[in-house]
Design a protein with these regions (language model features):
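Catalytic cores of nuclease domains that cleave nucleic-acid phosphodiester backbones
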Residues: 46-146, 155-168
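Charged, glycine-rich intrinsically disordered N-terminal tails and low-complexity linkers that flank
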Residues: 1-57
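Metal-dependent nuclease catalytic regions and adjoining charged, substrate-binding loops involved
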Residues: 2-3, 7, 72-79, 103-105, ...
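Short, histidine-centered active-site or binding-site loop motifs used for metal coordination
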Residues: 28-29, 131-134, 172-174
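Generic detection of long, well-ordered alpha-helical segments
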Residues: 33-41, 62-72, 143, 186-193
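Active-site-adjacent bridging/hinge elements
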Residues: 15-21, 115-129, 197-201
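Short coil/turn segments at secondary-structure boundaries
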Residues: 26-29, 59-62, 88-96, 213-223
Length: 243
């Protein structure tokens, strides 16, 4: 689900890791939302309610909700696969709040993992961190957002488990009917986290500082959905240089 009121939102981490001045420039813009974002939030909330306790859902609430049903089905299939593999204990957390303040350095910063599955076997423990995307733009699971959630989940459960592997997954029903995963280790996530901490420190230092403009890095990826690209001086300069 979307991250609310964060200066360094996990959902935009792939962009501010490249363009350090982006959060400072975007903070000057009034907050807004789109119809698509509101619809995505509604679908996330409905799916979470079903996964938490399907008996609390009225039958008509799932009418005309094929994407939500597909996501719920994918999570249930994943749980069943673990059962068939001989799991001893299986824990499911939905819409799990994760503390990311120790990673990004932003006080009180949180992210919300749509689904976390902890699978305890006799001699090892695996964890799935799954993010549901209800848009049309294909999303690769090898993103900073899902890695950030993965690291935050490892830190949350580290006193209980030493994970053999962490599976970071995306489910996007408008693109594919299957979960898409990458496999990482805790050590890989710790290395990633160190890079995030360093980059986040720079972005935070630019908050409210006019020198943030000197840290704007235009590019196709980070500018595509940037809400201030219409007034980004670095992008304007880059475009002018290409003419």
């Amino acid at each position: 689900m979307a991250d609310k009121h964060a200066f360094l939102p996990p959902s935009d981490a792939d962009n501010w890791l490249i363009c350090a001045g982006k959060p400072a420039l975007e903070e000057q813009e009034p907050e807004s939302t789109s119809e698509a974002a509101a619809e995505g939030s509604r679908k996330h909330e409905l799916a979470a309610r079903v996964l938490f306790n399907p008996r609390l859902i009225k039958p008509d609430e799932l009418e005309d909700e094929p994407e939500v049903l597909a996501y719920i089905g994918a999570v249930n299939e994943r749980m069943q696969a673990y059962r068939e593999a001989g799991v001893k204990h299986l824990h499911l957390a939905v819409e799990q709040k994760l503390d990311i303040s120790g990673i990004t350095g932003e006080r009180g910063a949180q992210g919300t993992a749509d689904c976390i599955i902890v699978a305890e076997f006799s001699d090892y423990v695996d964890m799935d961190v799954i993010d549901a995307k209800f848009g049309f733009v294909p999303v690769d699971p090898n993103t900073a957002q899902i890695k950030l959630y993965g690291l935050a989940a490892v830190l949350k459960y580290q006193l209980l488990h030493d994970f053999r592997r962490i599976n970071l997954g995306i489910f996007q029903p408008k693109v594919s009917d299957t979960l898409s995963f990458i496999e990482v280790s805790s050590d890989e996530l710790y290395v990633f986290g160190a890079k995030v901490t360093e980059a986040a420190a720079l972005s935070l230092s630019l908050r409210g500082d006019v020198t943030a403009l000197s840290h704007l890095v235009p590019g196709e990826k980070q500018c595509r959905f940037c809400k201030v690209k219409h007034r980004c001086p670095a992008l304007a300069q880059s475009v002018a240089a290409e003419v």
